[in-house]
């Protein structure tokens, strides 16, 4: 992932990534891939598809709980399939995390992270991020969280963030990983 200017008229930047689709491999949103309309149904779909695919789904949802992604709806994650045969190949890479990591706070509001974290909720109803993680966390996800013990952000040369902001945000991510 990288950063790029959203448009020439503003100073806003956005996260970018390479396209993961090719003429041979296409992306199908969760809502269309399995014909379901809830995260509970998604869990069942991935379990039926196989444990490795469920583990990928669980890791994405625990990651969302880690970064407080408030926008994980059923069209911004899904599967990759063979464009010619329709065979399901794998879960699509994680993307569209723009409404996370306290995106709504200004750089000078780093001391608001703990307070903000108390009120942010995931996109699926009637569950907190802590509950979301608790329902899906397993040994693989715990190992992934443990690996964040010395996590830090790499700043972008073309679009730098204030170092104090990145340091405080990385500290919050490390503490959050321990909590989960």
Predicted segments with their positions:
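A structural signal for short, well-ordered beta-strand segments and their strand-loop junctions
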Residues: 1-3, 16, 74, 91-94
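Conserved ATP-binding subdomain of kinase catalytic cores across diverse folds
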Residues: 1-32
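Helix-hairpin-helix/helix-loop-helix acidic hairpins
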Residues: 31-59
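Conserved protein-kinase catalytic-loop segment immediately C-terminal to the catalytic Asp
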Residues: 73, 78-80
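Active-site alpha-helical segments that house and flank conserved acidic catalytic motifs
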Residues: 58-67
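C-terminal catalytic region of ATP-dependent kinase domains
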Residues: 68, 80-180
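Short, flexible loop/turn elements at secondary-structure junctions
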Residues: 8, 19-21, 61, 81-83, ...
